[in-house]
């Protein structure tokens, strides 16, 4: 999570991602091999390509109060006190409305980002190597236990459930041992 000052510094300035500062501060502790991809992936402000409004709710570790950074991407931003049960950060995007068809019969459809698969694909494509876990609730299905009194004609029943899943790998393929990388990982890369 971030304090109000960190929200101001990291999100309030378009050209500042915090990466270079982090690299400088931590180079001595971690040696010269500090590999940094922006703390917020490839360009936090790219969110406004698909969102009409962005809200970041963040509570720094050890702080009693959370802070809320909000912007429509046009007229600045606000930072106010807010609430969050635990430390961490939530980024909430209000997607733009789908565009009407143009003369060529094409339109931008932002609702494609609302599918679980679409969102996971975007995260893995653009933020797979962010060093912090990016988690999302995913829908899964599992077989219910077979009742003890079920007959030979029993047909398995399934139930849907939600589970929090880490979507990004957090470790770039080039930082892994070759023995830990499967062929499918190479193919995807």
Predicted region positions:
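GHKL/Bergerat-fold ATPase module in large chromosome/replication-associated machines
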Residues: 36, 57-75, 98-101, 105-112, ...
């Amino acid at each position: 999570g971030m304090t109000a000052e960190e929200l101001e510094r990291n999100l309030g300035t378009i050209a500042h991602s915090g990466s270079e500062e982090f690299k400088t501060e931590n180079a001595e502790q971690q040696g010269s091999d500090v590999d940094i991809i922006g703390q917020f992936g490839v360009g936090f402000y790219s969110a406004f390509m698909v969102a009409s409004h962005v809200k970041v709710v963040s509570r720094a570790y050890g702080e009693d109060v959370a802070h809320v950074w909000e912007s429509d991407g046009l007229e600045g931003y606000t930072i106010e006190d807010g609430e969050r049960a635990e430390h961490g950060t939530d980024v909430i995007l209000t997607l733009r409305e789908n565009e009407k068809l143009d003369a060529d019969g094409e339109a931008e459809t932002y609702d494609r980002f609302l599918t679980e698969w679409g969102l996971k694909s975007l995260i893995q494509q653009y933020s797979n190597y962010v060093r912090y876990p990016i988690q999302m609730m995913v829908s899964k299905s599992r077989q219910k236990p077979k009742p003890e009194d079920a007959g030979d004609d029993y047909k398995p029943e399934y139930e849907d459930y939600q589970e929090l899943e880490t979507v990004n790998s957090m470790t770039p393929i080039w930082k892994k041992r070759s023995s830990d990388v499967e062929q499918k990982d190479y193919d995807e890369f």
